[in-house]
Amino acid sequence: IEGYIIILVSHKLDEVFELCKEATILKNGSKIKTIPIPFERKKIVDLMFKGDKSIDKIKNPISRIKRENMHIDLKYYKKGIAKIPEGKKIGVIGLQGSGNDQFIKKIFDKSISISRKINKNRIMIDKKNIYYTPSDRLEKGLFSDLTLIEHMALSENKNNFINWKKIKEYSRKKINEFNIKGTLNSQAKELSGGNQQKLQLSLIPNEKGLLAIEQPTRGLDLNSTQSVWNKINERIKDDICLFFSTTDIDEVWDQSDWIISFSGENITDISEKKDIKKSDIKFFISGIKTR
């Protein structure tokens, strides 16, 4: 359009190359570099992830205990059956809006079906055993105006009557166990992001299940991030498995046993962490490399 400047915000390299004459690369709110288009794609990806730790060392050792494989039906993505052992942490990584958060939602709404082997029979995991926490903590995960004790009452109430004495004791125990910085009467909207996330985790039933967590540490400071992962890692020892989405390469590398990479709402790679290098991930999520 003559006389106008159009600013396109995108994470899709194909789109930028097709529509733009130059591109400015941003990361965490800071300008990295402005470049002319066309430009070598590999160099753009390197600039996009400049400053990420490049150590390939695996931080969380993979358990050598043999577990039965889960079967993850990926026909929605025109893939076959992915086989991953139970008890694993599966990180689902992609740039913002690439489809990795939607993957977690699809596990919860059963668009992606997962089965496990019990007594030689393959059984589908029931929705009641899938414990989902959304990334929009106040919008979708919690009731902003309800207090901590009211959240606990809704979570624990198994019938039409609430025993407030028991709920008060239970709530105090959970607040202490998850180190939530708030009182029984604190509203969810009054909590920090880290404490809102810990409140979400505290509401997950104690029964064994499959954890499906969107962006577990988005927007959290270092201490809150570590605290949240400590609670998740305590829990996963006894659960079926954990699926979590993230846009952070360091987080997916540090916390995953298996990694599913997304670009443009498509799966570009599914690998056990020991079979790839950390440096591969940036190319998987930018769509430059697939397997």
Predicted regions and their residues:
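Glycine-rich phosphate-binding loops of nucleotide-dependent enzymes
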Residues: I1-R291
